UniProtKB/Swiss-Prot annotation:
GO BP annotations, alphabetical order: molybdate ion transport
Family matches, as InterPro entries: Mo/tungstate-bd_C_term_dom, Mop_domain, Transp-assoc_OB_typ1
NCBIfam families: Mop
UniProt KW keywords: Molybdenum
Alphabetical list of PROSITE patterns matching this protein: MOP (PS51866)
The Mop domain, residue ranges: 2-68
Function in brief: Binds one mole of molybdenum per mole of protein and contains a pterin.
Pfam families xrefs: TOBE
Origin superkingdom: Bacteria
Listed name of the protein: Molybdenum-pterin-binding protein 3
Length: 68
C-alpha cells in the first residue's frame, strides 16, 4: 500500500489496553521511544493488532495533540 503521509513511524506493539469501544495501543519505535494511539476495537480486529505485531504509525500533522 502506498500513502502520501510523510510522518510514518515503524515499531512493535508492546501493549494493547481494550476498553468498551476503543483500545489504547502502545507502539515502541526506534530508540525505545513509545507512541500511544487510541483506535476502535473494530480496527484492532480488522488489523489483527496484538502485542508483538509490527506496525507503522501514520501521523497527520493536523491531528497531533501534545500533552504536558
Amino acid at each position: 500500500m502506498s500513502i502520501s503521509a510523510r510522518n510514518q513511524l515503524k515499531g512493535k506493539v508492546v501493549a494493547v489496553k481494550k476498553g468498551l469501544v476503543t483500545a489504547e495501543v502502545v507502539l515502541e519505535i526506534a530508540g525505545g521511544d513509545k507512541v500511544t494511539s487510541i483506535i476502535s476495537l473494530d480496527s484492532i480486529e480488522d488489523l489483527g493488532v496484538k502485542e508483538g505485531t509490527e506496525l507503522t504509525a501514520v501521523i497527520k500533522s493536523t491531528d497531533v495533540m501534545i500533552l504536558a
